[in-house]
Every structure is written in C-alpha cells, then in structure tokens.
Amino acid sequence: EKRKNMNYSECIENARTRIGNYCKACPECNGRACKNQMPGPGAKGVGDTAIRNYDKWKEIRVQMDTIAENKPVDTSLELFGKKFKYPFFAGPVGAVGLHYGDCLDDVAYNDILVSSCAKYGIAAFTGDGVDSNVMVAATKAIKKTDGIGIPTVKPWNLDVIAGKMEMVHESKALAVAMDIDAAGLPFLKNMEPPAGSKTVEELRQIAKMAGTPFIVKGVMTVKGALKAKEAGASAIVVSNHG
C-alpha cells in the first residue's frame, strides 16, 4: 500500500493514536510531559535531566558562512571506513512495545528503522533489553543491510556480553556500542552476578570481544573520555541516558 507523505504536524497527530502511554508525541520533544516515568523517555528522580539536556542542545547553532563556492554543500561523514550522507544517526531504542505501545514489535521496528536509515545514507543504533529477542531482532536487521547499523549492548555481566557479541559478529555490524550510562538500571544491578558499572579493565576486555570498532555511549566528563580511550574505545557518545 502506497502511503502519502506527511508533514511534521500530521506525523505527530498520527503518532498520538499509536505510541502508547509514556511518550505523549509532543510537538517539541523536550522531556517535560513525560518526566519522572519509568519506563519511558522521560527522566527519573526529580525528572529534569532530559529537560536540561534539551535546553542545552538548543544553545548549539550551526554557524552561517555564505562566503563560499556556489555549489551543493557536502554534509557527508566518513566513519570507520564507511561514508554517510549526513553527520547524524538514529539513536538506540530497545523493548519498543514496553516504551512506545504495541503498534510495532522489536522485529518490525528494527526492520523499518535499520533498512530506512541505510537506504537514505545514515545508520541506526539499535537497542537491547531483558528480552533476548530484542538483540536478536536488531542484529538480524543489521545483517540484512550488510552491516550498516550499530547494535548497542547494555552493560551486562561479561558472560552475557560475550553471548551478545556473537550476534554482533554474525551481523557484520560496522561497529558496536555499549550504553554504560544504563549502569544504574535496577534490572542490571539486581542480576547475579551483578551487571552495571564497568572498570577500565572490564571495558578493555569488552572492546577485545567486540572485534569491531567499540563505541562507549554514556560519557559526560573529560576524565570519563580518557578512561574510555585507555580501555580501547574507538569513539564515545556524550550521553547520560536522559
């Protein structure tokens, strides 16, 4: 079935009937309407972290300079030997049904996201979760695009991570990430053996397991960036998990 093109307002209006109870499909995704809800995109505790993140992003502007050759602007980016059309990727979401309603399951969501990003010249980060099928679906979707996608593995214990990395290898993913800013999630801390925070040495072991460029997502300080570099990370993502 051929779908009509939608403008942003129509997209938001349509989303409100499909996206579940946590995300409110706001015109401006600023963390205010969804704060202090778990699960969901808003922040826990006093609920201002996602809000402060968004407010800080608004301070960043592209500097205009029109004194240049009159030709199309090159927005491309080269990363890990691959060239992308634009310098932004789709962020990772795991357990889609839990967070964003039952309109799409993880298999359908990842198939749409990963293939569409690859088709239009960027790449998708994919998520992870307590349901092992989340990573299975993500890596299968990435394999279909010849590795144009980046699985994001949660900071489980090392045995669980090793199993996840096998799926990453099978997918031929261009890189793999770990969202170390998920270290405080209760379902990780309550595992046996405990999961969560990782030392430099543990991250070094994980980077070796990866066998592909390893991205540490969840670095907020210079000290953290230097630790990630010491552990053998190929890149970092500045993030605090919202």
Task: Identify the function of each model-found stretch.
Residues 49-135:
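N-terminal functional module of multi-domain proteins
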Residues 88-91, 122-126, 147-153, 176, ...:
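Hydrophobic faces of well-ordered beta-strands that scaffold small-molecule active sites
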Residues 123, 134-159:
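Long, hydrophobic, well-ordered secondary-structure blocks that form the structural core
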Residues 42, 102, 126-129, 153-154, ...:
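Glycine- and other small-residue-rich loops at beta-strand/loop junctions that grip anionic moieties
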Residues 45, 105-108, 193-198:
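Alpha-helix N-cap and loop-to-helix initiation/capping positions
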Residues 115, 144, 156-242:
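Alpha/beta enzyme core
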Residues 91-106, 150-159, 212-220:
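Active-site mouth loops of central-metabolism enzymes
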Residues 3-84:
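An N-cap/entry alpha-helix motif that binds or orients negatively charged groups
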